[in-house]
Amino acid sequence: MYGEKAKKVLLHIIRSGGIVAEETLGKDIGMKSNEARKILQQLADEAILRYKTGRVGDKTLHLWILNIDQIEGILIARLKKTREKLLIRLNYEKNNTFLKCPLCGRRYTFDEAFENDFLCPYDGEQLIEYDNSEEIRILEEKIKEITDELSRIGAA
């Protein structure tokens, strides 16, 4: 979802009992404070975390708490959203003919190639037909994996 850095933040939060202070997070995991704060905000935007302030003596702490009770719903929603995007991409791959530049490797739809007289607009090479059956196979496989997982948890 957000890469290795977000994974590092989440694992630290989980290992810390589901709650961390923003003020110490960056130092604890070896990350810049502003970078950690940005990841915390992204995770909060997805409702994976919630924010709360607390006081310790005269200091105000910014606490981030894992939304354990909502994680399943969040993951189901994310899986469905991912499946929908993959279905859109699969439809695009199945309903277009592609050509590829043998020199730079850029890929074009038939319409794009036609507009450029079947020459690569970057280097002038003659475009060749491109077989996207492997992309289609991978997309179908991933869609099936997600659908099977959603069925397994009763959320298809």
From Swiss-Prot:
Keyword flag Electron transport: no
One Gene Ontology biological process: transcription initiation at RNA polymerase II promoter
SMART domains: TFIIE
Entry's family note: Belongs to the TFE family.
Keyword line: DNA-binding, Transcription, Transcription regulation
Record function comment: Transcription factor that plays a role in the activation of archaeal genes transcribed by RNA polymerase. Facilitates transcription initiation by enhancing TATA-box recognition by TATA-box-binding protein (Tbp), and transcription factor B (Tfb) and RNA polymerase recruitment. Not absolutely required for transcription in vitro, but particularly important in cases where Tbp or Tfb function is not optimal. It dynamically alters the nucleic acid-binding properties of RNA polymerases by stabilizing the initiation complex and destabilizing elongation complexes.
GO molecular function annotations of the record: DNA binding
Domain HTH TFE/IIEalpha-type as annotated: residue spans: 1-72
Keyword Endoplasmic reticulum included in the entry's annotation: no
This protein's domain notes: The winged helix domain is involved in binding to DNA in the preinitiation complex.
Assembly: Monomer. Interaction with RNA polymerase subunits RpoF and RpoE is necessary for Tfe stimulatory transcription activity. Able to interact with Tbp and RNA polymerase in the absence of DNA promoter. Interacts both with the preinitiation and elongation complexes.
The name this protein goes by in its record: Transcription factor E
